[in-house]
């Protein structure tokens, strides 16, 4: 498109051409008047014609200049408005550019924060996995220790039960022999009617039924049943036995 300067140059050229055309017409009329100097009756008419053309030329020149000045003023105002609009557009563009730069910096900062958070999350997940694995190992080890302790406790309880049963049996046997010996001592210290007919073996055999019928003892047997180190059943039984 044409710029303001191009349009002004075009108007000036047009004005110059119109002015030259009017001047040429006046010159032609002047030549015609000079050629017709011999005609006195046309002198006044030619003078009037020349005056009319001069007035017309002056009017055209003035109108052209006024139009040119008006057009120039309009274009200058339009140019000023365009310059103001351009200035505002540049200012707005600069503001948009500043906002874009600020948003770009903010986006970069958010990206950095996001990457940092993702890295921390990965580290937390890795640490959690390690701690979880370690905890599972510890739990498995503790469960194994508990099972071993329960087995060991059950073993000790069984050994204790066996020892208790053996002790009870020994106590019963010792008490039985003690009573037998006390009974024999009592028979020996008793006066015998005929020593020649006394038989120690017969005396012991005779004494044993008497002791069995005379002395008795309550035997308490306590049974403890365990499973995995825990007592699941406990019972007590009374038995009559010799002492």
Curated annotation (Swiss-Prot):
Location of the region described as Tail in the Swiss-Prot/TrEMBL record: 185-243
Keyword Acyltransferase: no
Tissue: Expressed in low amounts in retina, optic nerve, and brain and in higher amounts in spinal cord.
Pfam family, one: Filament
Coiled coil found in the keyword field: yes
Coil 2: annotated segments: 46-184
Annotated protein name in UniProt: Vimentin A2
Species in which this protein is naturally found: Carassius auratus
């Amino acid at each position: 498109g044409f710029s303001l300067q191009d349009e002004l140059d075009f108007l000036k050229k047009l004005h110059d051409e119109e002015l030259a055309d009017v001047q040429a017409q006046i010159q032609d009329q002047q030549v015609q008047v000079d050629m017709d100097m011999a005609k006195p009756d046309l002198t006044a008419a030619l003078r009037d014609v020349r005056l009319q053309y001069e007035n017309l030329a002056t009017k055209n020149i003035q109108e052209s200049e006024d139009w040119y000045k008006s057009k120039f003023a309009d274009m200058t105002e339009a140019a000023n408005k365009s310059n103001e609009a351009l200035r505002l557009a540049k200012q707005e563009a600069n503001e948009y550019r500043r906002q874009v730069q600020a948003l770009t910096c903010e986006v970069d900062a958010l990206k950095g924060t996001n990457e940092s958070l993702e890295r921390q999350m990965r580290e937390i997940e890795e640490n959690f996995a390690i701690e979880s694995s370690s905890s599972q190992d510890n739990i498995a080890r503790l469960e194994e220790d508990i099972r071993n302790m329960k087995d060991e406790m059950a073993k000790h309880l069984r050994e204790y039960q066996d020892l208790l049963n053996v002790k009870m049996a020994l106590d019963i046997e010792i008490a039985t022999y003690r009573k037998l010996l006390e009974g024999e001592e009592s028979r020996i210290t008793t006066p015998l009617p005929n020593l020649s007919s006394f038989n120690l073996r017969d005396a012991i055999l005779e004494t044993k039924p008497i002791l069995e019928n005379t002395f008795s003892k309550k035997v308490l047997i306590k049974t403890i049943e365990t499973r995995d180190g825990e007592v699941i059943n406990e019972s007590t039984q009374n038995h009559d036995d010799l002492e």
